């Protein structure tokens, strides 16, 4: 988030792209016992992912220390805490944290409620949600970008540019979501087939994917709006809307 806030989103992108081959290498090596590493089977996937993130942490520390635009901030240097400066980060961070928790928790709760319907229903539901999370990456990315851009423009007292970015961001998110949903609708059998081969599983997964289409268009609008409000330093309203939408309605 610190790197993104400085507008260095490409640095963050390269770090996360680096995580993919690292994760593949450690997972493959520890699951099947390759390159002198022990064969751990399923648990090797968890250990491999943990090791990949540790390597990524080391790389990120090096970037923070060596990157010319990050080095002057001395992020890793120790200074005496200034408690007076904590108020604003907590005022913004706590509602955002509760917002994320509320959204993740409701989907986790739904997963638990699905348990009584049998393993095939759980698997189909999980497959549909997994692909929905992938589709949600587009509006979520636009939301994060709008938070950065809008806050920049507001800081420069440039309300006109901020409004232009807001309109452009929401429009882009809706268009991408619409194209994604059209593609998803006509390719449901292929997507379901990626997660299993049973005909009954594929048919049930297609039903869940159809339901997921209903809320993804709403996410295409809601996610950018959340990013916009955070750019205006308003984190309470997205939290209230999340609480009402996910836990009350």
Label each PLM-derived region with a short phrase:
Residues 1-12, 111, 124-188, 219-233, ...:
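Small-residue-rich hydrophobic transmembrane alpha-helices
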Residues 26, 56-59, 219-222:
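Membrane-embedded alpha-helical transmembrane segments of multi-pass integral membrane proteins
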Residues 1-36, 47-51:
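Hydrophobic transmembrane helix module of multi-pass membrane transport proteins
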């Amino acid at each position: 988030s610190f790197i993104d806030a400085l507008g260095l989103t490409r640095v963050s992108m390269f770090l996360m792209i680096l995580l993919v081959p690292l994760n593949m290498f450690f997972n493959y090596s520890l699951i099947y016992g390759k390159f002198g590493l022990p064969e751990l089977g399923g648990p090797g996937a968890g250990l491999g992912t943990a090791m990949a993130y540790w390597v990524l942490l080391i790389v990120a520390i090096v970037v923070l220390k060596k990157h010319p635009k990050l080095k002057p901030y001395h992020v890793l240097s120790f200074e005496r805490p200034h408690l007076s400066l904590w108020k604003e980060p907590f005022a913004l961070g706590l509602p955002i944290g509760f917002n994320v928790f509320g959204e993740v928790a409701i989907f986790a709760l739904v997963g638990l409620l699905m348990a009584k319907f049998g393993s095939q229903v759980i698997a189909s539901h999980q497959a549909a949600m997994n692909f929905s999370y992938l589709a949600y990456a587009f509006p979520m990315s636009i939301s994060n970008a709008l938070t950065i851009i809008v806050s920049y423009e507001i800081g420069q007292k440039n309300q006109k540019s901020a409004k232009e970015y807001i309109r452009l961001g929401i429009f882009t998110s809706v268009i991408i979501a619409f194209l994604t949903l059209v593609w998803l609708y006509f390719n449901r059998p292929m997507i379901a087939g990626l997660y299993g081969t049973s005909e009954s599983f594929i048919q049930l997964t297609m039903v869940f994917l159809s339901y997921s289409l209903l809320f993804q268009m709403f996410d295409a609008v809601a996610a950018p709006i959340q990013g916009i409000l955070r750019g205006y330093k308003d984190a309470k309203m997205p939290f209230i809307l999340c609480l009402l939408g996910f836990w009350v309605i």
